[in-house]
Amino acid sequence: MKQGLSLTAAGVAVALVSFLPGGPAQADPGPPSVEAAAFRPIDTGDRAAVREAVLKRLRPALAAKVKWSGSVSGCVAGKPARSTQQATLKAVNFFRAMAQLDPVTFDAGLSAKAQKAALMMDAENSLNHFPPRSWKCWSKAGAEAAGRSNLCLDCTGAASVLEYMTDEGPGNTAAGHRRWLLFPFVGEMGSGITSGAGALWVIPGERVRAKSPAWVSWPTPGYFPNELDPAGRWSLSASNEKIDFARAKVSVRTADGKALAVRRHKPIAHGRPNYGSPALVWQVTGFALPTGTRSRRLDVTVSGIRVWNQADTALTRKKITKKYSVRYFDADVA
């Protein structure tokens, strides 16, 4: 049974951890570096392209068996098998490709620390971004990674990436796991995997320059497979750090104009970079996923978005409205 993906603790951890480059790799090199697959962005305007990506990129990654060489009883961190790391990386980069973001690589040093974090979570059968020294298999490197990683218990490898993207649960209304996975300004992550827990180092030591879309949403605009529906928890992030969602309003309508029920969560505020980019998260209910060859279009309007001035002293007069459409479809049907 999957445990909660504890974002509340993660949010606090992120707020308290400064953006400093990670320290040198430990003597144990940990899991090997895995180069990012050369995934070009997925054309979400093309149903066939999205379907092909789901069938050939995502599903094989999710089906990969989790293998690792460590031992919980012996507090041996070990390493994931290369095939397990590759599958996890492919899952991460699939979701980034759906959002038109650059792929990432897994850094060996970050992965070694994340591996020790995953070991602690598995050994203690619990999740904590501030694991106390009393925990089984505690290590300084593992504790550091715990504060910078997405954590999952009873979900590991590529399957944990899907859990992070869904980001269900009352403690995850900021969709932090998802938003860090889709953070535009990161080039390296680290992956720790045991048979019972996963730790994915997602918070960068420093931001990297990257081409990024102005907006990063989930679900993404265009064709979107039913199987990736995030249980109605939608999000919109801004690459521009000056964006302010404090008074933004959201509407989601069907293709015939029917308004769906929307519950807006507390926005991720401007000026809090340790929580990732400014963002708005909301819950959508009242629609059914399509079957057969049909698709179902949902039109999103986010209005009342404001922009801070360059000095961050006041909001400008500028107001932005962001509109986009999502077309759900069944990827099992050509």
Roles of regions detected by a PLM:
Residues 124-129, 164-169, 209-212:
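Short linear motifs at secondary-structure transitions and domain/linker junctions
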Residues 1, 10-11, 157, 162:
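Generic hydrophobic alpha-helical membrane-segment signal
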Residues 2-112, 116-120, 124, 187-188, ...:
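N-terminal targeting leaders of exported, membrane, and organelle-targeted proteins
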Residues 64, 89, 128-145:
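Extracytoplasmic/secretory soluble proteins
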Residues 5, 11, 108-110, 131-134, ...:
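Solvent-exposed, flexible loop/coil residues
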Residues 30-40, 136-200:
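A well-ordered secondary-structure block
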